[in-house]
Amino acid sequence: MMNNNGFSTGEEDSRGPADQICCLLDDGERCRKQAGNASYSKRIQKTVTQRRLKLSIDSHARHIYICDFHKARIQCARTKRRRRDSEDDSNETDTDLPEVDLYQLQVNTLRRYKRFYKVSTRPSSNKAQLSETIMKHFKTIPIKEKEILTYFIYMVKSNSNKLDQKNNASAEAT
């Protein structure tokens, strides 16, 4: 078995990532998702450190393959950084991303979100601080845009939208 500073050289894993689980620890807990073909390189490790993602490689892992979920999460953090850098250069804001005003929510709702996602805040945070911290977390949640848009288009084309059905029923009644 060839081992290089805790990282696999890949020589001992000729079977590939097909039957392996992700090599990452997510907030101290080993990920149980199936590993894809993306590997946890030093460049990715640097991105994880810079973006303060709570990810690290499991020292007991015999490979460096990561799952698609963590790959997407790391890519999301990387593209957000690029986007912010380019906004700073051009003095423009990203207009195609809608801004959600979490301050409009009740404090109990914000606290419930905080508890559900285990977002750490100061114990005596006021509503403004709480909504700001939650907004930072909210923006880090990865979404599958293609999947969501495909589903939306399918629902519209197949008239499966409940709002469309209500509108058609009221139009037929008149």
UniProtKB/Swiss-Prot annotation:
Cystine connections: none
Instruction: Quote the Pfam families the UniProt record gives.
Output: SAP30_Sin3_bdg (PF13867), zf-SAP30 (PF13866)
What is stated as this protein's family in its record?
Belongs to the SAP30 family.
GO MF entries: DNA binding; transcription coregulator activity; zinc ion binding
What name does the UniProt record give this protein? Answer: Histone deacetylase complex subunit SAP30 homolog
InterPro entries assigned to the protein according to its UniProt record, in alphabetical order: His_deAcase_SAP30/SAP30L, SAP30_C_sf, SAP30_Sin3-bd, SAP30_zn-finger
What is an annotated GO biological process for this record, any one? regulation of DNA-templated transcription
